Amino acid sequence: MDAIKKKMQMLKLDKENALDRAEQAEADKKAAEERSKQLEDELVALQKKLKGTEDELDKYSESLKDAQEKLELADKKATDAESEVASLNRRIQLVEEELDRAQERLATALQKLEEAEKAADESERGMKVIENRAQKDEEKMEIQEIQLKEAKHIAEEADRKYEEVARKLVIIEGDLERAEERAELSESKCAELEEELKTVTNNLKSLEAQAEKYSQKEDKYEEEIKVLTDKLKEAETRAEFAERSVTKLEKSIDDLEDELYAQKLKYKAISEELDHALNDMTSI
């Protein structure tokens, strides 16, 4: 911009000098015209006074010729000066037009720079929001990982208790089978004792008491089996709930990973837009 202004000042100075030269040429032209007119008057007077003096006539004719040449030269200088002034005017006009275009480009560049700065500010705010959300998501993921570990621990504990209950149930089933075998044996003995009832009444009473005792044990075993069955069902219910909790937590983690991936893509797109804006600013 300073170079263009300096160039315009030089062109204006050249224009003023050309105008001064044109005015000087015009003055010389007028002076020559006046001198020519004066010489013509003097020539007429001399012709009237010195009709016979050819040398003087030639002398004044030569002076007149010189004056005419000077007049023609002055006309030529004036014409050249006018052409130069017109050329300078055209150059000044072109420079002014170029200056206007440069100012328009500068205004456009400044506007783009301002827009790029605004975009950069918005991108920075967006990045801060994304970073905050990502930090919150990471904290949430850490909490959910802790919950997942707790759920897995609960599930493992439920499995362990289930295995323990199953093991106890196997033991109880073995005891029950043995009790049934003993009961069958007792029934067989009872049948034998019934045949000998008449002869061994005391033994029959003893056997009846023993059979009642076995019956009470059977009821007790059945009650224990029922309690163990209820506990087994409760353990299975807790295991199913733990599995559902694990599934929900895994789904929440997958959703958070998808959201985090989407935020990373959005952050990458914003970074690329910012790079393009900075590249545009650099190219300008």
UniProtKB/Swiss-Prot annotation:
Modification N-acetylmethionine occurs at:
M1
Q: Basic and acidic residues composition bias: which ranges?
A: 12-38
- Which spans of this chain does the record mark as coiled coil? 1-284
Q: Where in the cell is it found?
A: Cytoplasm, Cytoskeleton
Q: Which GO terms describe its cellular component?
A: actin cytoskeleton; actin filament; cytoplasm; plasma membrane
| GO BP annotations listed | actin filament organization; cardiac muscle contraction
Q: Does the keyword NADP apply?
A: no
Name the predominant localization: cytoplasm
- What's the superkingdom here? Eukaryota
For region Disordered, the annotated ranges are 1-38
GO molecular function terms listed in the Swiss-Prot or TrEMBL record: actin filament binding; cytoskeletal protein binding; identical protein binding; protein heterodimerization activity; protein homodimerization activity
Mind telling me which Pfam families this protein's record contains?
Tropomyosin
Question: InterPro entries under this entry?
Answer: Tropomyosin
Task: Write out the entry's keywords from A to Z.
Answer: Acetylation, Actin-binding, Coiled coil, Cytoplasm, Cytoskeleton, Muscle protein
User: What quaternary arrangement does the UniProt entry report?
Assistant: Homodimer. Heterodimer of an alpha (TPM1, TPM3 or TPM4) and a beta (TPM2) chain. Interacts with HRG (via the HRR domain); the interaction contributes to the antiangiogenic properties of the histidine/proline-rich region (HRR) of HRG.
* PANTHER family given in the database record: TROPOMYOSIN
Protein family per UniProt? Belongs to the tropomyosin family.
Free-text note regarding domains: The molecule is in a coiled coil structure that is formed by 2 polypeptide chains. The sequence exhibits a prominent seven-residues periodicity.
> What's this chain's function?
Binds to actin filaments in muscle and non-muscle cells. Plays a central role, in association with the troponin complex, in the calcium dependent regulation of vertebrate striated muscle contraction. Smooth muscle contraction is regulated by interaction with caldesmon. In non-muscle cells is implicated in stabilizing cytoskeleton actin filaments.
Question: This chain belongs to which protein, by name?
Answer: Tropomyosin alpha-1 chain
